[in-house]
């Protein structure tokens, strides 16, 4: 979406249209996507291109009959990629139907371990609510896994058993329960998605005393 080449940006819109058709056929409503990398341009220039592509994508989806679909730009794990929290929230500002996909493992990786405490999670949730409003922020999309990182950000996804890698899921599940937030949460652990998703569900239910 942020490419210097217009053809590639236009192709991104077509990919979203194709994804919308498949999503509808499967009974889904949310389309998660990556907004691109900065490449040889500044972050500001890359974001402006992505914002323009996003506006065109929303228009194209509406014209094609997919106005009921929710676009979800994802926070990204590599430093060179477009996808900081604020960049994703800026993309969400294009249309009130756009919902952020917050990948907490990615944010932890690109900030080189910036999510260490419950307060760190709370700051992310607070920022979403500040920019989007409480109602939109309540129903965001979540990807979660422990991720190994280097100086450039994300390297590899791991499992919940690999506790040498962060971030920790427990504080997030507690905050979701305490704040009565209702995101869609997808576990992206390496090979143990179902098991680790169940672990998060148990943490969430315990925090709600269910």
Predicted regions and their residues:
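Active-site acidic/histidine proton-transfer and metal-coordination neighborhood
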Residues: 1-101, 109
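Gly/Pro-rich active-site loop or hairpin
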Residues: 3, 44, 82-85, 108-182
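Short acidic/polar active-site loop segments enriched in Thr and Asp
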Residues: 29, 182-183
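Conserved beta-strand positions in the central sheet of alpha/beta enzyme cores
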Residues: 32, 101, 143, 185-186
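Active-site beta-loop-alpha junctions enriched in small/polar residues
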Residues: 36-38, 74-78, 105-110, 142-149, ...
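A structural signal for the main folded, soluble domain(s) of proteins
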Residues: 48, 54-56, 60-70, 115-119, ...
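Short helix-capping segments at alpha-helix termini
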Residues: 60-68, 93-97, 132-136, 178-180, ...
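C-terminal helical cap(s) of enzyme catalytic domains, especially alpha/beta-barrels
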Residues: 194-210
């Amino acid at each position: 979406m942020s490419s210097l080449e217009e053809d590639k940006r236009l192709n991104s819109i077509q990919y979203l249209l194709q994804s919308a058709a498949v999503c509808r056929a499967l009974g889904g409503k949310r389309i998660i996507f990556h907004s691109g990398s900065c490449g040889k341009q500044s972050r500001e220039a890359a974001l402006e291109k992505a914002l323009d592509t996003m506006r065109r994508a929303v228009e194209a989806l509406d014209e094609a009959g997919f106005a009921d679909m929710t676009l979800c730009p994802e926070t990204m794990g590599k430093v060179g990629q477009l996808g900081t929290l604020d960049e994703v929230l800026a993309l969400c500002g294009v249309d009130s139907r756009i919902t952020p996909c917050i990948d907490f493992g990615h944010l932890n990786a690109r900030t080189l371990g910036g999510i260490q405490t419950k307060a760190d999670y709370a700051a992310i949730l607070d920022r979403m609510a500040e920019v989007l409003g409480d109602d939109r922020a309540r129903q965001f999309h979540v990807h979660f896994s422990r991720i190994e990182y280097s100086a450039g950000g994300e390297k590899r996804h791991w499992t919940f058993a690999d506790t040498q890698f962060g971030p920790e899921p427990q504080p997030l599940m507690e905050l979701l329960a305490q704040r009565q937030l209702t995101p869609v949460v997808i576990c992206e652990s390496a090979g143990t998605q179902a098991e680790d998703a169940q672990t998060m569900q148990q943490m969430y239910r315990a925090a709600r005393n269910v």
